[in-house]
Each structure stands twice: as structure tokens, then as C-alpha cells.
Amino acid sequence: MGVIGTTVIAILHRAAPLACAAAGALATEYAGVLGIFMEGVITFSSFCIAFFALVWGSYWGGLGITVCVVPLCLFFVAVGTERMRANPFLTGIAVHFSAMGMSAFGASSMFARAAASAMQMDTAAHGVSFTHVSLAHTRVLPHPLWGTAVAFALVWVFHLYLYSTNVGINFMHSGEGALALQVRGTDAARYRMVSWAVAGVCAVCAGGLLVLRVGTYTPQMAAGRGWTALAIVFLARKRMMWCVPAAIFFSGIEHMCDVLQGTHVVPTGVLFALPYILSLVVFVCTRRTSPCRRGERRRSRLLFAYLQRVTCA
């Protein structure tokens, strides 16, 4: 395989978890509650997958228990947010910092007891820190290429579900079209709560792909991908399939940064900060599309045509 083929595969490997994270963030944006918690949940999901994989000796075991626990926890948080009429943005920030804190605590205590033999101790900071865990000895660790293909396929299936089913159409308009759904007798709050669980599933998939690709767990596993996913939502104009090219674009820039690190042309600190800088630029420069714009008018026509069809039936 040539240099170009190797580079393309490397970029696709990087883009797969980012596309999953962007799909989860877009799901919450559709419901009107932007998933500001994606960065922390991805990190916490990576920690849970690595921890249970070390305990049970199976990558699939760690992924299975995490994909059940994390979305369920987010769903309960969403239910509490709706019942208490709390601000979902502030709740999302609290979830983010809580997830980051639990990941750091678990990496320094739980891993030390569960898999001390697999630890690579980092003494560069404050004494001995059990924060870098090798998963090389776990069973049934599949090839990363399969995970990348499955991730893109799941994003495509999610896209088809949203645009091809009545529930998917309701879900897409549960944020901006909440009043229209209420007139029809559908409670938009249910879709808002479900969107948190959907974002949790996508975050677990992103964390699982990161663990699968790297083969280790570190507290910096997410590396800003949660924030980049939020930027992709607006860069892709809230279109599910546009999230994949946007994720590939950001992954290409990330790969370029890794290549430039070996040349010492650009300071390392600037390269590390580049994904965050690009996310900030996208947030500032990308305008939120209003309902009167062409894309929103098309979605509104689809919604009201669907409502008219249901009413006439």
C-alpha cells in the first residue's frame, strides 16, 4: 500500500469516532438541547470500556456493559432535567465536569487495584500516576478497520431512520417544531430525553473506537473531539450525512498536525491547540440557520406535509 493509501486509511480511522460524536451532538441539537457534555462522556466511556475490558479480559464485554450503563445514566439525568425544569445547558456542563472527574478518579484508583500488572506508571508529574493503561492482553480485540466501517455504516443508518420514519421526522423537529408536535398530541419532551440517551450511545461508540484504535486508555483520550463534534454540527448545517465529510476534514487537519510535529516547523503547543482553535473559529463564523432559510423551509414542509397526511388519515 502506498503513502497515499496509508494516509487515507489513517484519516478515516481518526474520522470514525469523530463522526459518531457528531451524530450524537446533532441528535441533541435536533431535540433543542445541544449536547455540551460530549467531551466528558467520551472520556468517561473510554475509561469504562477499558476498565471492564481489563476486569473481564474482553473488549466486547467492556463495550457491552458501557453501552448499557452510560446512555441509561444520561437518560435519567435528562428525565430529572425535564421534571425539575432545569437549564439543559447548565446540566450538560455539570455532566461534562462530573464525567471528567470520575474518569480521573477511576484512572488513579480503580485501575490501580484491578489491573496493576498492566500499568505503565507515569512519574513525570506528581509521583506515581496510574493513568496510562495497556489493553494488549485483552481477548477478542478486533481490527480497527472493522470498527471504522461499522461506525460510518451506523451514521448512514441513523440518517435513513431520521428521514424515512415518522418517529425520525418527529425527532428532527422536536426542538424547533415542538409546538407543531404538541398540536398533534405528541410530547416533545420525550424526544428531548431520548436524545440524551442517543448521544450517550454515540459517545460510547466514539470512546470504543478510540480505545480500539489506540489499544490503551489515557485521561486525554477524547483530545477535544467532543468540542470538535459540536463545531461539526454547525459546519454541516445540521445535516447528518454532512457530518461525515466534516469529520474527515477535521481528521485530515489532525493528521497533518501529527506529521508536522516531527518537522519542528510549528511549535508543539500550537499543534495541540489547533483542533480547539478550529472549533472556536467554526462556532464564531458559522451562523445558525433560521427557519426561513432554504434548508429549514424544506424540513418544515416535510413536517407539515407529514402532519397533514396523519390528520387526514
Curated annotation (Swiss-Prot):
Spans through the membrane: 4-26, 36-56, 60-80, 88-108, 140-160, 194-214, 240-260, 265-285
GO molecular function list: transmembrane transporter activity
Keyword terms, alphabetized: Cell inner membrane, Cell membrane, Membrane, Transmembrane, Transmembrane helix, Transport
Subcellular location: Cell inner membrane
Membrane topology: Multi-pass membrane protein
One Pfam family linked to the record: BPD_transp_2
Keyword Nucleotide-binding attached: no
Origin superkingdom: Bacteria
Gene Ontology cellular component list: plasma membrane
Primary location recorded for the protein, binned into one broad class: membrane
Family: Belongs to the binding-protein-dependent transport system permease family.
Subunit structure and binding partners: The complex is probably composed of two ATP-binding proteins (RfuB), two transmembrane proteins (RfuC and RfuD) and a solute-binding protein (RfuA).
The protein's role, per its UniProt record: Probably part of the ABC transporter complex RfuABCD involved in riboflavin import. Probably responsible for the translocation of the substrate across the membrane.
Protein name: Probable riboflavin import permease protein RfuD
